[in-house]
Structures are given as structure tokens and as C-alpha cells.
């Protein structure tokens, strides 16, 4: 199992290395689970989100990757932007046995004007597929700094 986690982390590092200025963010995600959040913008509307986090309650490592799309027309702050985002992704839980599921991230991200930061809130329903089929819901708040 650890070989798979190391392979996934290596793949993420490769993807991050192709990022260009201002499109790659790293930050903290707090909630269930808590850890590190990465975002790689593809354009103004689409991005890849990656997470490596630890579940305090269940003592499990979470590794996730999502493809998200942003809708800028719902919320209109007076300064900056605040799109609603939604997408699809995958999650692996690593403990004694591997647990694999499909995620549907739903969130709001605030991007202050003139900064290299974003702040986000998300709820992520997840359909676990292996080793058993069941539904999970994770939630978190966080921020990222963009390079």
C-alpha cells in the first residue's frame, strides 16, 4: 500500500513541477481530514485539486485528486471573486487496508483582488467503493498561497 501512496505523491510532484507562475497554490486544509491542499489552475474556470491529509478521528491518511469547474456568476463580492466550484475526483484512504472512493467536491472559494491567496470552504460527498460500498461526507475550510 505504501508503494501506491509513494507513486501517487511522486505523480503529484511531477504535475506540480509543470505549473507556471501564479497558477499553483499550496496551503492548509482544516476539518475532517486536516492536511495540505494543492491547486493547479488549468485556466480561469478549471483546476486540479490535490490533498494529502490525516484523519484525526479515524487515524487514516487521505490522498485525493479532484478536477473542479468554477461558476463565477452566483456570488458577486464587492472586491475580488468568489466562485462556486464543483467537480469529480478520487480518494484513497491508507491504513491497514486500502479504501478507494469517488468524490464530488462542492465549495466556495474567495480570491481577494490583488493578492496571491485564496480562502475556501467545501463539502465533499464520497462514495467509497473498496473494500465496501458506503457514503462518506467530508468538510473543510482552508487557504492557499499561489506561486
Show the residue positions of the predicted features:
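Short loop/turn motifs that connect adjacent beta-strands in outer-membrane beta-barrel proteins
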Residues: 19-23, 44-45, 72-83, 96-98, ...
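Residues that define the transmembrane beta-barrel architecture of outer-membrane proteins
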Residues: 22, 32-34, 46, 59-63, ...
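Transmembrane beta-strand segments that form the barrel wall of outer-membrane beta-barrel proteins
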Residues: 22-32, 42-56, 84-94, 119-127
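Residues on the lipid-exposed face of transmembrane beta-strands in outer-membrane beta-barrel proteins
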Residues: 28, 36-40, 52, 65-71, ...
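Gram-negative outer-membrane beta-barrel proteins
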Residues: 34-36, 56-58, 73-75, 94-98, ...
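Predominantly the C-terminal beta-signal and adjacent terminal strand-loop region
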Residues: 113-147
Amino acid at each position: 500500500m505504501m508503494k501506491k501512496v509513494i507513486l501517487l505523491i511522486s505523480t503529484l510532484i511531477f504535475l506540480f513541477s509543470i505549473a507556471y507562475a501564479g497558477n499553483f497554490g499550496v496551503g492548509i486544509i482544516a476539518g475532517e481530514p486536516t492536511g495540505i491542499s494543492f491547486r493547479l489552475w488549468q485556466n480561469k474556470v478549471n483546476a486540479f485539486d490535490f490533498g494529502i491529509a490525516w484523519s484525526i478521528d479515524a487515524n487514516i491518511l487521505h490522498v485525493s485528486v479532484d478536477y473542479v469547474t468554477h461558476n463565477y456568476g452566483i456570488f458577486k463580492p464587492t472586491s475580488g471573486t468568489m466562485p462556486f466550484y464543483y467537480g469529480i475526483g478520487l480518494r484513497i484512504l491508507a491504513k491497514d487496508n486500502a479504501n478507494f472512493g469517488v468524490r464530488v467536491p462542492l465549495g466556495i472559494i474567495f480570491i481577494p483582488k490583488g493578492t496571491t491567496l485564496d480562502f475556501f470552504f467545501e463539502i465533499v460527498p464520497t462514495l467509497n467503493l473498496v473494500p465496501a460500498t458506503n457514503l462518506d461526507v467530508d468538510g473543510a475550510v482552508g487557504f492557499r498561497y499561489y506561486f
